[in-house]
């Protein structure tokens, strides 16, 4: 149930009946304050002048045509021409009942789309570090939300599995295998492995020459070199899968669509762009000049798609990637969770994609960029020694801190239960601290804040959920008994909680459209706060009679279900007790 969409359509029809153009925007928003109702329509300001009226005159005209019978108990004009809408308690009660009767909590299913989501994208032969965290968990929250809404989602893990460095890595792997026969390498070895390979490449000309030859052989499809390359990819992705599972993200090996996937397409794309007159030779390289992007001299910027030596660039791969996602995966929409520093690069690749007709304008290519993770000093998050923080080390520390926190509060908890709870709290805290911030901004990584039981944090939200569940344990009532009971809304706090519960679909819709999980976090935090106020002022177990008691239990029940489902769309685990 999307009340905002329902009201928007009703107000729009009334505006048209009052003389507004058919494309008018009613601008229905949640009211900022309770005294202004549940929703407010602000669209009169933009339209009134065109009709030769004041916004208030238009609002008065709109009210004569606005039929919200059975939806609103009161509609009034405020200020210069805002329309305040107060939802009818009977309408709220009816839709709370409907939400409780549905596994989806009354959330409708939009028209199904095929949506490709590009996220995580670690590099082969390197361990995942904190720089991969944001893309991985924000992208996964978007995927979970889109799937819940009923879309077909294709996860695309654009792994860095190709490039000239693989000659060097294969040469070093070969040397290691000869010297350490039978030893299986793990990724922890690969961190040092990469450094050692690079050191030899820089210092040993014979090794460097061999590495360069290996690149040529790998790129020509030689089976021995392909096998060595696959071994490096397998070692990396096996280790990365452990991290994905610890993070409770939904990526698997089946979702890997590395850079190498697009290699066979690159020569054809360069030839096609030349044939279309979009790409030209410039100083030996193949270049596309884009009028939309200017260099320092104010001339169209040249984007190289093939180097003088015949090698291809990331841009060429990204052009092929977009083409593949439309033509082969049949995407209706493509979302890229890549940091903001890549924005111009992506815009240039997509400008070429559009000019070449590889992806029509009707299929959105969206860069859902994000800022950086910073330390308390406001600088990029590093180890004390100034190095890159490995993601596995960060998760180990989260678990250790959560273990201490949980043990302090529950000294008698059995060890296995403590470990399970510490994992939910620790991993949840790291993820929620990131997801609760607007992805477009940088954010400060702070252990004390993220593990606090106050404020908009995972531990607070997990505790809020267990608090609602505890009401049911005390009530000793089964779900069948409760299902038959009516919902009655008489108190203001009951109405405020019910109205917020029924805004779950609106919140999901915003997250799906904008790729902004922080909107869901803000909604759930607000919901938990409203439940707190309701619980304090509207006695549940000691209500004046059974009818009121059961009605309030149903509001508590929908609160618990909404918190659990909302946190699940974020990939945050809930627990029964804390």
From Swiss-Prot:
<dbReference type="InterPro" id="IPR014729">
    <property type="entry name" value="Rossmann-like_a/b/a_fold"/>
</dbReference>
<comment type="subunit">
    <text>Monomer.</text>
</comment>
<dbReference type="InterPro" id="IPR005148">
    <property type="entry name" value="Arg-tRNA-synth_N"/>
</dbReference>
<keyword id="KW-0547">Nucleotide-binding</keyword>
<dbReference type="InterPro" id="IPR009080">
    <property type="entry name" value="tRNAsynth_Ia_anticodon-bd"/>
</dbReference>
<dbReference type="InterPro" id="IPR001278">
    <property type="entry name" value="Arg-tRNA-ligase"/>
</dbReference>
<dbReference type="GO" id="GO:0005737">
    <property type="term" value="C:cytoplasm"/>
</dbReference>
<dbReference type="Pfam" id="PF05746">
    <property type="entry name" value="DALR_1"/>
</dbReference>
<keyword id="KW-0648">Protein biosynthesis</keyword>
<dbReference type="GO" id="GO:0004814">
    <property type="term" value="F:arginine-tRNA ligase activity"/>
</dbReference>
<dbReference type="GO" id="GO:0006420">
    <property type="term" value="P:arginyl-tRNA aminoacylation"/>
</dbReference>
<comment type="similarity">
    <text>Belongs to the class-I aminoacyl-tRNA synthetase family.</text>
</comment>
<dbReference type="InterPro" id="IPR008909">
    <property type="entry name" value="DALR_anticod-bd"/>
</dbReference>
<keyword id="KW-0030">Aminoacyl-tRNA synthetase</keyword>
<dbReference type="Pfam" id="PF00750">
    <property type="entry name" value="tRNA-synt_1d"/>
</dbReference>
<feature type="short sequence motif" description="'HIGH' region">
    <location>
        <begin position="122"/>
        <end position="132"/>
    </location>
</feature>
<dbReference type="InterPro" id="IPR001412">
    <property type="entry name" value="aa-tRNA-synth_I_CS"/>
</dbReference>
<dbReference type="GO" id="GO:0005524">
    <property type="term" value="F:ATP binding"/>
</dbReference>
<dbReference type="Pfam" id="PF03485">
    <property type="entry name" value="Arg_tRNA_synt_N"/>
</dbReference>
<keyword id="KW-0067">ATP-binding</keyword>
<protein>
    <recommendedName>
        <fullName>Arginine--tRNA ligase</fullName>
        <ecNumber>6.1.1.19</ecNumber>
    </recommendedName>
</protein>
<keyword id="KW-0963">Cytoplasm</keyword>
<dbReference type="InterPro" id="IPR035684">
    <property type="entry name" value="ArgRS_core"/>
</dbReference>
<dbReference type="InterPro" id="IPR036695">
    <property type="entry name" value="Arg-tRNA-synth_N_sf"/>
</dbReference>
<keyword id="KW-0436">Ligase</keyword>
């Amino acid at each position: 149930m999307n009340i905002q969409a329902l009201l928007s359509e009703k107000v729009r029809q009334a505006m048209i009946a009052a003389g507004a153009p058919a494309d008018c925007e009613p601008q229905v928003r949640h009211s900022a304050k309770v005294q202004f109702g549940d929703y407010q329509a602000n669209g009169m300001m933009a339209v009134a002048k065109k009709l030769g009226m004041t916004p208030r005159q238009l609002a008065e005209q709109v009210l004569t045509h606005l039929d919200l019978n059975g939806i609103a108990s009161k509609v009034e004009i405020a200020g210069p021409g805002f329309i305040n809408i107060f939802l009818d308690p009977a309408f709220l009660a009816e839709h709370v009942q409907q939400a409780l009767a549905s596994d989806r909590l009354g959330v409708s299913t939009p028209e199904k789309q095929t949506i490709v989501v590009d996220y995580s994208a670690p590099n082969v032969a390197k361990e995942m570090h904190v720089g991969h965290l944001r893309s991985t968990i924000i992208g996964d929250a978007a995927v979970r939300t889109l799937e819940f809404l009923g879309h077909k989602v294709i996860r695309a893990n654009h792994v860095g599995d190709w490039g000239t460095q693989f000659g060097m890595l294969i040469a070093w792997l070969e040397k290691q295998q000869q010297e350490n026969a039978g030893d299986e390498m793990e990724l922890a070895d690969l961190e040092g492995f990469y450094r050692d390979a690079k050191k030899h490449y820089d210092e040993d000309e014979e090794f460097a020459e061999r590495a360069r030859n290996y690149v040529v052989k790998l790129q020509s499809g030689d089976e021995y070199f392909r096998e060595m390359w696959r071994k490096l990819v397998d070692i990396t992705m096996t280790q990365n899968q452990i991290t994905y599972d610890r993070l409770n993200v939904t990526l698997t090996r089946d979702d890997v669509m590395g850079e190498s996937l697009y290699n066979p397409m690159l020569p054809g794309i360069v030839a096609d762009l030349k044939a279309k007159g979009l790409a030209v030779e410039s100083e030996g390289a193949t270049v596309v000049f884009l009028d939309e992007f200017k260099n320092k001299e104010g001339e169209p910027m040249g984007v190289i798609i093939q180097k003088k030596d015949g090698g291809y660039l990331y841009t060429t791969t990204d052009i092929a990637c977009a083409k593949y996602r439309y033509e082969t995966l049949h995407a209706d929409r493509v979302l890229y969770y890549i940091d903001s520093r890549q924005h111009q690069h992506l815009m240039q690749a997509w400008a070429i994609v559009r000019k070449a007709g590889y992806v029509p304008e009707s299929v959105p290519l969206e860069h859902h960029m994000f800022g950086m993770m910073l330390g308390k000093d406001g600088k990029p998050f590093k180890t004390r020694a100034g190095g890159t923080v490995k993601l596995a080390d960060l998760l180990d520390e989260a678990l250790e801190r959560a273990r201490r926190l949980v043990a302090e509060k529950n000294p008698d908890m059995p060890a296995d239960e403590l470990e399970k709870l510490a994992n939910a709290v620790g991993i949840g805290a790291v993820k929620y601290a990131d997801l609760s911030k607007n992805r477009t901004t940088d954010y400060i990584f702070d252990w004390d804040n993220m593990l606090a039981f106050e404020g908009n944090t995972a531990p607070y939200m997990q505790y809020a959920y267990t608090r609602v569940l505890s009401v049911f344990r005390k009530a000793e009532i089964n779900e069948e008994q409760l299902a038959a009971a009516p919902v009655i809304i008489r108190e203001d706090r009951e109405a405020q909680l019910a109205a917020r519960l029924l805004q779950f679909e609106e919140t999901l819709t915003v997250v799906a459209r904008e790729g902004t999980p922080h909107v869901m976090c803000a909604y759930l935090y607000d919901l938990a706060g409203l439940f707190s106020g309701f619980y304090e002022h509207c006695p549940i177990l000691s209500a004046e009679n059974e009818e009121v008691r059961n009605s309030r239990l149903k509001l508590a029940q929908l609160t618990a279900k909404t918190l659990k489902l909302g946190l699940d769309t974020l990939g945050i685990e809930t627990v029964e007790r804390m």
